[in-house]
Design a protein with these regions (language model features):
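Structured helix-beta-strand junction loops
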Residues: 30-32, 62-63, 86, 105, ...
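A secondary-structure boundary/capping signal
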Residues: 6-7, 39, 112
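General small-molecule cofactor/ligand-binding pocket signal
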Residues: 34, 66, 128
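Phosphate- and divalent-cation-binding pockets in alpha/beta enzyme and binding domains
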Residues: 13, 42-43, 75, 118-119
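Short, hinge-like loop/turn segments at secondary-structure boundaries
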Residues: 51-54, 83-84, 126-130
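Short, well-structured N-terminal submotif of metal-dependent ribonuclease cores
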Residues: 1-35, 44-58
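Acidic, PIN/NYN-like endoribonuclease modules and their adjacent C-terminal/linker elements
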Residues: 1, 99, 103-133
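Active-site neighborhoods of divalent-metal-dependent phosphate/nucleic-acid chemistry enzymes
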Residues: 65-112
Length: 133
């Protein structure tokens, strides 16, 4: 199964935290992993300078890029409402969009973000076993 790597997991890796999420990203660099444009945008926004931007682009290019389609926005809104209805409000709507793309792609998500923990509790999103909130 493809692993969709969220921005929070990339941050763990880039900071070399030594966490299980960090180590899993390192392991996935040579296997089947995916991102979407929203993850790419968030990671690239953190570039310190042009040189770092180039390094980040090279790193992200190792992942398959899954395009966001129009239906993903409706699905993201539905995921948000499902979580809210179950007593957990997702803090960042972009996480719902990323989750919608991962679900459509039949991929599990690797994350270090409480929003994805909530999404995986109340929707069909599957969290990678090494994920942490």
């Amino acid at each position: 199964m493809t692993v969709f790597v969220d921005t929070s997991a990339w941050i763990e890796f880039l900071r070399d935290t030594g966490s299980s999420v960090c180590n899993t990203v390192d392991d996935l660099l040579s296997t089947d992993m995916a991102i979407c444009d929203a993850v790419s945008m968030e990671v690239l926004a953190g570039a310190r300078d042009e040189r770092h931007l180039g390094q980040l682009r090279g790193l992200l290019a190792r992942a398959s890029l899954v395009a966001i389609i129009a239906a993903d926005y409706d699905d993201a809104a539905a995921l948000y409402r499902i979580c809210r209805r179950n007593g957990e409000t997702v803090r960042k709507l972009i996480d719902c969009l990323i989750a919608a793309v991962a679900i459509r792609s039949n991929a599990m998500i690797l994350h270090a973000d409480g929003d994805f923990a909530a999404l995986s509790r109340h929707t069909s999103l599957v969290a990678h076993p090494c994920s942490s909130p």
